[in-house]
Amino acid sequence: MFSSLMLVSLLVLTLPIMLSIFNTYKNSTFPHHVKNTISYAFITSLIPTMMFIHSGQETIISNWHWMTMQTLKLSLSFKLDYFSMIFVPVALFVTWSIMEFSLWYMHSDPYITRFFKYLLTFLITMMILVTANNLFQLFIGWEGVGIMSFLLIGWWYGRTDANTAALQAILYNRIGDIGFIMAMAWFLFNTNTWDLQQIFMLDPNLTNLPLLGLLLAATGKSAQFGLHPWLPSAMEGPTPVSALLHSSTMVVAGVFLLIRFHPLMENNKTIQSLTLCLGAITTLFTAICALTQNDIKKIIAFSTSSQLGLMIVTIGINQPYLAFLHICTHAFFKAMLFMCSGSIIHSLNDEQDIRKMGGLFNAMPFTTTSLIIGSLALTGIPFLTGFYSKDLIIETANTSYTNAWALLMTLIATSLTAVYSTRIIFFALLGQPRFLPLTSINENNPFLINSIKRLLIGSIFAGFFISNNIYPTTVPEMTMPTYMKLTALAVTILGFTLALELSLMTHNLKLEHSTNVFKFSNLLGYYPTIMHRLPPLANLSMSQKSASLLLDSIWLENILPKSISQFQMKTSILISTQKGQIKLYFLSFLITLTLSMLLFNLHE
């Protein structure tokens, strides 16, 4: 029953795409149709989700045979388990709010209908990825979110930065896709199937190679350390794109892939250790990078990358349900933070530099209140949405001594989260206004207010509802020292205090020269400088030298002109060194003749 209802809610999403074939696509009401369709799909999806939670079933798989290729049977297969049943309503709710926000933010764009079509396709491909039960179907969704992110990041294609950012996103994801395809090939070769339940049932040995491929895929898609530079660059797209990309679609796809494969990962300690280290490095590195950024959207982008690192850490300590809880809770406040920043940017005539803001608390009370609550939820203040997942992750990491290194990095990153959140509030909302006095600020638009209001309610209450319905629903009694329970809160408060102390110090003490730590953070750990400059420079110089050696030096000089000139020179030297003494020549003839006659007579 509820599998049919869930599939109906997913099919409803395709209606606007079908209608866009006809003239309604040209109609100005098309964006409103898309927004309403998503809201209906969300309400419809709530019914099967509630039924699923209360029925206590584990998984429902709907199978339609598609094709058979020799021994491989491909089917259109939907897997409706806890992960997909909870994620679909969350993604639909967040996207509904983002669509409504887009009606206000993109109202003057001449191609708004195409923009909404792209956003809807983006959502549909994510739904395909989440509900897929075989690797081929999952790959379709995986590539779908990749190409849609490329189109949406480069929406304002007249700007060079937007084009570069879109190319960067697609190229970094290509590196990840190599890992995915390698894993697909390995599973096909060793298990002769792409269906997830069959792979888990066969439980192949020596899964290091495919899981390494899947980890590489997740690193590319979820912007983990090494393949992370595309995420802050993606801020060149419109704010609704940033909100959708960073909350419930693209970036969580990599984490979701690892969650799907947790039955294989939990038995492989090598991959788990690697995942734990990768997540810990990412969460700390990106938190450090966020500290000195001045673009409001880039700070929030780096915070996304930091939270994704936290999710990867959670998978590394073998807690997939906890990582999934953090995906769901993170979607609400992260989308709201982007929408609040979009509201500020739009009101200040596209100004993104937080140093040119200030005093917005009086001018935009609703937006600033939402921004503060979103920042508090991000830092994990008790009883807001972020607390229910973030606090649990740190508590769970505390249960084993082997996690000590990763736990320390996670705690430092959690503290730094409070620092950069305070920095946004301090620079953008408090103090004296630093923008032009003639700027007209107006946030009284129902599309803007309603969309942020819904996510604000979600940022306060969603964590409580989702965490109460996460497995296991009957929680075993746990004993934990009070100091351990309060660790996460303590480091957050420490971060707030540190940020305020530093802000007060900087007013009194001005550094003459920026320190190396500041430079490291501001230049993003020198990573883009090294990786985006040195390899192209090395390739360019190497290709230039090889081209000049092969074409100019060898072919044009050494083989034809130089070889001929060398031959002529040696010949002329040989000829010119002859003395012209005819007696010697005759004598040499005579010696030769005498020797030949002697040899002839000797033979006889």
Curated annotation (Swiss-Prot):
GO biological process entries: electron transport coupled proton transport; mitochondrial electron transport, NADH to ubiquinone; mitochondrial respiratory chain complex I assembly
Gene Ontology molecular function: NADH dehydrogenase (ubiquinone) activity
Transmembrane segments: 2-22, 41-61, 85-105, 115-135, 138-158, 169-189, 209-231, 239-259, 271-291, 299-318, 323-345, 364-384, 411-431, 455-475, 486-506, 582-602
Keyword ATP-binding attributed: no
EC number: 7.1.1.2
The protein's assembly and partners: Core subunit of respiratory chain NADH dehydrogenase (Complex I) which is composed of 45 different subunits.
Catalytic activity: a ubiquinone + NADH + 5 H(+)(in) = a ubiquinol + NAD(+) + 4 H(+)(out)
InterPro entries per record: NADH_DH_su5_C, NADHpl_OxRdtase_5_subgr, ND/Mrp_TM, NU5C-like, Proton_antipo_N
Intracellular or extracellular location(s): Mitochondrion inner membrane
Membrane topology field: Multi-pass membrane protein
Family statement drawn from the similarity comment of this UniProt entry: Belongs to the complex I subunit 5 family.
Entry function: Core subunit of the mitochondrial membrane respiratory chain NADH dehydrogenase (Complex I) which catalyzes electron transfer from NADH through the respiratory chain, using ubiquinone as an electron acceptor. Essential for the catalytic activity and assembly of complex I.
NCBIfam families associated with the record: NDH_I_L (TIGR01974)
Enzyme class, spelled out: translocase
Pfam families attached to this UniProt entry: NADH5_C, Proton_antipo_M, Proton_antipo_N
Protein name as annotated: NADH-ubiquinone oxidoreductase chain 5
Cellular component annotations (GO), alphabetically ordered: mitochondrial inner membrane; respiratory chain complex I
Keywords assigned by UniProt, alphabetized: Electron transport, Membrane, Mitochondrion, Mitochondrion inner membrane, NAD, Respiratory chain, Translocase, Transmembrane, Transmembrane helix, Transport, Ubiquinone
Main location: mitochondrion
Keyword Transport annotated: yes
